[in-house]
């Protein structure tokens, strides 16, 4: 039997038993959808194949996609918002790197030194994930494809997007107005 230790979105540590290794990613997805995380972000961020970026299942690491009011796609992980950045290929005498997509944010004073990366000047940032090179891994993709998964991706052309149920706001029942000479009841 395997065990995974998660940190809930409220900071509690929870150990979950996994019957078989074939269920490991399913368990991570389940608790990741709740915002629970396991482990720490590695220095430089998680490394994934670039072919997985379009339909990556962010719940595997306890993250979720979110679209800002300005329309910018972000990834939320442990209360921090990470921006999508496209990095050009590097081809120099000393370094050759293929193009990549990185999700990162500006570093904060509370971030441990080992996760901070230097940029131009005095700017530091923290990377959540980088998608570069490699061969596609189906196990990292959203199960059942990206369409209609709530991860912010459109349905493929020629296929209708699944309708997303709309949440209805709960409204308190209207209270009758207080009549003159009548005292209002204390709510507790």
From Swiss-Prot:
Keyword DNA-binding carried by entry: yes
Effect on the protein of changing residue 135 to A: Reduced ssDNA-binding
Alphabetic keyword roster: DNA damage, DNA repair, DNA-binding, Stress response
Effect of residue 94 to A: Reduced ssDNA-binding
Effect of residue 108 to A: Reduced ssDNA-binding
Induction, per UniProt: Induced to high levels following extreme ionizing radiation exposure. Also highly induced in response to desiccation stress.
Any one Gene Ontology BP term: double-strand break repair via single-strand annealing
Compositionally skewed regions (Low complexity) per UniProt: 152-173
Disordered: annotated span: 140-188
InterPro entries assigned to the protein according to its UniProt record, in alphabetical order: ssDNA-bd_DdrB-like
GO-annotated molecular function: single-stranded DNA binding
Subunit architecture: Homopentamer arranged in a ring-structure; DNA binds between subunits and along the top of the ring. The pentamers self-associate to coat ssDNA in higher-ordered structures; oligomerization facilitates the assembly of extended nucleoprotein complexes. Self-assembly does not however require ssDNA-binding. Interacts with SSB.
Domains: entry comment: Contains a novel ssDNA-binding fold, which is structurally and topologically distinct from the OB-fold universally found in standard SSB proteins. The disordered C-terminus of DdrB may mediate interactions with other proteins important for DNA damage recovery.
Function: ssDNA-binding protein that contributes to the ionizing radiation resistance of D.radiodurans. Plays a role in DNA repair and genome reconstitution in a RecA-independent process. Required for recovery from severe genomic fragmentation as a result of exposure to severe levels of ionizing radiation. Binds ssDNA but not dsDNA. Stimulates annealing of complementary ssDNA. Does not complement an ssb disruption.
Record's protein name: Single-stranded DNA-binding protein DdrB
């Amino acid at each position: 039997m395997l065990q995974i230790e998660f940190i809930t979105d409220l900071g509690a540590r929870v150990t979950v038993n996994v019957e078989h290794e074939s269920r490991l990613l399913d368990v991570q997805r389940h608790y990741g959808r709740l915002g629970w995380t396991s482990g720490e972000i590695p220095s430089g961020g998680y490394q994934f194949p670039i072919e997985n970026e379009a339909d990556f299942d962010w719940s595997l690491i306890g993250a979720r996609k979110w679209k800002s009011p300005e329309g910018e796609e972000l990834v939320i992980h442990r209360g921090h918002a990470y921006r999508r950045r496209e990095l050009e290929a590097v081809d120099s005498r000393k370094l050759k790197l293929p193009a990549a997509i990185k999700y990162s944010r500006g570093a904060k004073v509370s971030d441990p030194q080992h996760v901070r990366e230097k940029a131009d000047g005095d700017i530091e940032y923290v990377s959540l994930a980088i998608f570069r090179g490699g061969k596609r891994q189906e196990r990292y993709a959203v199960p059942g494809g990206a369409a209609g998964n709530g991860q912010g991706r459109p349905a493929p052309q020629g296929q209708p997007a699944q309708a997303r149920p709309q949440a209805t706001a709960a409204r308190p029942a209207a209270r009758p107005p207080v009549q003159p000479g009548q005292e209002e009841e204390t709510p507790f």
